[in-house]
Swiss-Prot record:
Keywords: Developmental protein, DNA-binding, Nucleus, Transcription, Transcription regulation. SMART domains: FH. This is Fork head domain-containing protein FD4. The keyword DNA-binding applies. The gene is fd96Ca. The lineage of its organism: Eukaryota, Metazoa, Ecdysozoa, Arthropoda, Hexapoda.
């Protein structure tokens, strides 16, 4: 007996699983991907049975989307209205239906663990890049941001303040708010551009303002002898010690690090010595990454501040890409490396070179063995 046609289902439940219904909705889209709301709309428009008890079947459909590897969640482009990600069908899942029939499905589609982890990492990175450029476009152009050099990224760390602010009160007196404290290391031109961050007009504390109720004991070396040795009194007179009600703060530092200098000249020497002694560079703040930034993951080939970068600092690669996605099927092999140039003018990214694996390592990965 032939199966009934689609139009004759009426109020009866159609013989399609939730996976088949979702795949049918995705395939009906010109871009082969749809947000969740459009998937709901397609099903209710096509099959009257699903116009009632919507909460029940929509919960089941969301469960199938989340726990089936045949569906992938593609981040929404920032230039598209609406909210929520898009759902697409994995290219390797096209043959899970026998002879292209949505009524019969082969065994459950399952991705290899390594492929699934790689895909999730790439899609997460893509979502972060989309969010970053969306923030840049709304908050200001990347051309107005100060360039960042990873060689000087260590200089962007906040150096310790001359005096601890852990127990400072919220105000200097009744009705007088406590001003913001800006370290001396952040005021130079070699560090973050304060004019772009809107911090040029912040007041700074003077030495007399922060001297108030706090005092700082001399720092001690981190040795057993220094820890068990009693502290030497700062005041030779016992009367002065009794009258002194200032809060003492013990600060223990590792040997080899001198006390933070308070004079400008000594501060510059301290900064130079500190930079040379640091062995690792921190990740730069997100708001400072722009076309002039040399971050290993983000290689910009063109942009507003790229002229200041040496040509040798950016690796050569024949593949260039931007952040827009036009079709999920074109990005599955390497999602970030196969995006099309649609928007984000003056920002072109160069995909990093593919990591080489020896045949032995690749065989271990294919056999789902853990390698260290």
């Amino acid at each position: 007996m032939p199966r009934p046609s689609r139009e004759s289902y009426g109020e009866q439940k159609p013989p399609y699983s939730y996976i088949s219904l979702t795949a049918m909705a995705i395939w009906s889209s010109p871009e082969k991907m749809l947000p969740l709301s459009d998937i709901y709309k397609f099903i209710t428009d096509r099959f009257p049975y699903y116009r009632k008890n919507t909460q029940r079947w929509q919960n089941s459909l969301r469960h199938n989307l989340s726990f089936n590897d045949c569906f992938i969640k593609v981040p929404r482009r920032p230039d598209r209205p609406g909210k929520g990600a898009y759902w697409a069908l994995h290219p390797q899942a096209f043959d899970m239906f026998e002879n292209g029939s949505l009524l019969r499905r082969r065994k459950r589609f399952k991705l290899h663990k390594n492929d699934k982890d790689l895909l999730n990492e790439e899609l997460t990175a893509l979502a972060n890049l989309n969010r970053f450029f969306f923030t840049t476009r709304n908050g200001g152009s990347a051309a107005h941001m100060s360039p960042l050099d990873m060689n000087n990224a260590a200089a962007m760390r906040l150096d310790p303040l001359p005096r601890s602010t852990a127990h400072m009160p919220n105000s200097l007196g009744p009705g007088v708010p406590l001003p913001h404290v800006m370290p001396a290391s952040m005021s130079g031109a070699d560090h973050t551009n304060l004019a772009d961050m809107g911090l040029t007009n912040l007041p700074a504390l003077t030495s007399s303002e922060i001297e108030g109720p706090l005092s700082l004991r001399p720092k001690r070396s981190f040795t057993i002898e220094s820890l068990i040795t009693p502290d030497k009194p700062e005041h030779p007179s016992e009367d002065e010690d009794d009258e002194d009600d200032r809060v003492d703060i013990d600060v223990v530092e590792c040997s080899g690090i001198s006390r933070y200098p308070t004079t400008p000249a000594a501060s510059e020497e301290y900064m130079s010595a500190s930079r040379s002694s640091r062995t690792e560079d921190p990740l730069p703040p997100m708001h400072t990454i722009n076309a002039g930034a040399h971050v290993p993951f983000l290689h910009y080939a063109t942009g507003a501040n790229v002229a200041g970068l040496p040509a040798s600092g950016i690796p050569n690669s024949p593949t260039t890409y931007e952040l827009a996605i036009s079709h999920p099927l074109f990005m599955m092999a390497a999602p970030i490396a196969n995006m099309h140039n649609i928007y984000y003018n003056n920002v072109t990214l160069v995909a990093p070179a593919q990591q080489y694996r020896s045949p032995e390592v690749q065989n271990r990965i294919d056999n789902d063995m853990r390698t260290i």
